[in-house]
Amino acid sequence: MWRLRTGSSTVDKADSWLSSLNNHLGRQIWCYDPEAGTPQEREAVEAECARFTANRHQQRQSADTLLRLQFQKEHSANRLPSRITVNEDHEVTEDDVTTTLCRALQFYSQLQTDDGHWSGDHSGPMFFLPGMVIALYVTGALDSVLSEHHQREICRYIYNHQRQDGSWGLHPEGTGTLFGTVLSYVTLRLMGESKSNSNNREALRKAQTWIIDHGGATDVPSWGKFWLAVLGVYEWSGVNPLPPESWLLPKSLIAHPGRLPVLYRFIFLPMSYIYARRLSHHLTKIIEDLRKELYTIPYEDIDWNHARKLGAKEEIVPRSVVQDVILSILHNYVEPIMSHWPGFLLRQKALALIMEHIHHEDETTQYLCVCPVSKALNMLCCWLEDRNSDAFKKHLSRVLDFLWLSEDGMKMQVCNGSQLWDTALSVRALISANLLNECSSMLRRAKLYIENTQIQESYPGDLDHWHRITSKGGWPQSTRDWGWPVSDCTAEALQAVLALSSQSTTDVGEALPEERIHECINVLLSFQKSNGSFAPFDARNPLEGPKIWNHTESPGYKSLDFECVECTSSVIQALAAFNKIYPEHRAKEISISIQEGTRFIERLQNSDGSWSGTWGICFTYATWFGIMGLLASGARYYESIAIQRACEFILSKQLPNGGWGEHFHSFKNKVYTNLEGERAHVVHTSWSMLALLATGQEGRDAIPLHRAAKILINAQMETGDYSQEGVVGAVCGDHTISYATYRCVFPIWALGEYRYKLFGKKNMYI
């Protein structure tokens, strides 16, 4: 039976390659224990897994049930008050809200780990996992890192998210793509699945048929071509150039890859190394079979130079004529020169520089790396450099950090989790609930996690050389070991810390030292770009980077480190909250920063009053952030046309049942799109309530708030939990992400604010 282990309990004493800055605080690993669990517990797990499979085409998002089953067993709670139901013709009472909050808080307390954070599914893009599996297979480490139990769960996950036509999307909710289908099919085959010996032979047959019917693997985007070439089922002559020499260009040139958004930069870095080394797995039976199964014509007859230019039209951003010309020149003329003497000498210099950067990234993230794609690629590079190196062994010890198990199977997370982010938001929600008897223990433990996760080290060496900004004082998305400060994570953590400082030290402990808060302000201010926005990772990149190196060909390319209302709003809120408590510290700089950020938010507002989301779905999420950012800057509803228009937008989207529910297709449609059947979603309803409550909606017309509160009260389950209703997170604007804690956090937050604003209850002991 699978069990989630956290913190130091995740460390195998026989593994000497793991390192940590704070004794693995926040680390979370799913481990298989054949002796664990009673027969009844195993039966319950199997029933949940079977239930998901039976309903997988109707409900594609897992509910993180396995975590809940384990933690509810380990962290027993007091008997819950009876569930509340408010009929359509009845008004919401204070007791209704208080009881619902108490039930929600008691349930949520069971999900908190011993070290103070909240764990949860943070998966999304399905193409992350194939890259890691291919990397492990090529290095010969697949079976040593992933046990048969891991591989069985990975296969179950992939099969569960296959669409009825045989394809796979880029994420569980997405329509079928050649990229997703080819990589998922290859992953299953590498794990021993075949049409002759698998219980899922029909699923494999349908997948292969879909691939062939859609042009075969020659039509996958460049990223897919790259991974297939590494595996040895595609030729490098069919891959667009990824010249490592570009890293030797003067940094002042716009074509320097150091100007790429952070995530793309740290993916292009190892890709260019592997491209230059032409890594390709040797021919095996499975490689030979895949060469036959993935293409519409015999492998030896494929025109690879022609294939290099191919790509499914619906899956890529079309390249411009200029881009095509540059890539052709690089492929036909520059690459032959760099592959032979004397150009080879320059290539060797570039490769040495790249490995310096890779080792720096590995060492400053404890071999976790900024994302799972760069993790797999960096691991390959270390293996290529020295197959017996300590660096490669340290990489292998960190693979399991990215894997998460739910009732739909084992998947790869967007990061090594979202522990800090979820915990910071949870603190703010718990404080808003104003029920200290229910919250004080949770808050005390969460505070310790947040404090101990703050980055307390500066990046070693010259920041400009390593393409970094200052790190000391920032907060990461997940764990301190991950090491990357993120603007909105830092801002939300600071707001949580400042909110905790207003609570009784008897309840939550001593406040964070001023010096560390000041260090956080240094980091936050460094994120601001010249246009007033705050980037997620790096403020130094221009708005127009070197598009020629957009190796993903993804339509979400620009959103990864460019204009973002959510990050900008979070930082403005944090700076404003800090300024109220510490009005003398860098006051002028903070004032100017807030003004510039506010102007950016106002410029970004859409004509209908909304804002477009980047990290959540979509207009609902971003409009809440837009409003909160403007309010933090000092704007008020009756004085701000922007806030008035935003509130009008939100109210115009309220459903007849009183809730809100937005489909992730809003990203693609570029217009607000309701969920099918005009269903309400508790998280979207909560975001809308929080936005309206912050602007004083209760004083203008409280009826929309009462109707929304009924949705949140009536949607609560017998356990105090809320059901999984659909995806809520996003990345790049075109890939969905799961945030399993949101369905608990935001109803608590919204009902807490509703209770305070409508019934005037604050800091109650009950």
UniProtKB/Swiss-Prot annotation:
Q: What class of enzyme is it?
A: isomerase
GO MF annotation terms? intramolecular transferase activity
Task: Cite the Gene3D superfamilies for this sequence.
Answer: 1.50.10.20
List the pathway annotation: Secondary metabolite biosynthesis; terpenoid biosynthesis
Tell me a GO biological process for this protein: triterpenoid biosynthetic process
Question: This protein's superkingdom?
Answer: Eukaryota
* Protein name in the entry: Alpha-onocerin synthase LCD
Q: Which organism is it from?
A: Lycopodium clavatum (Stag's-horn clubmoss)
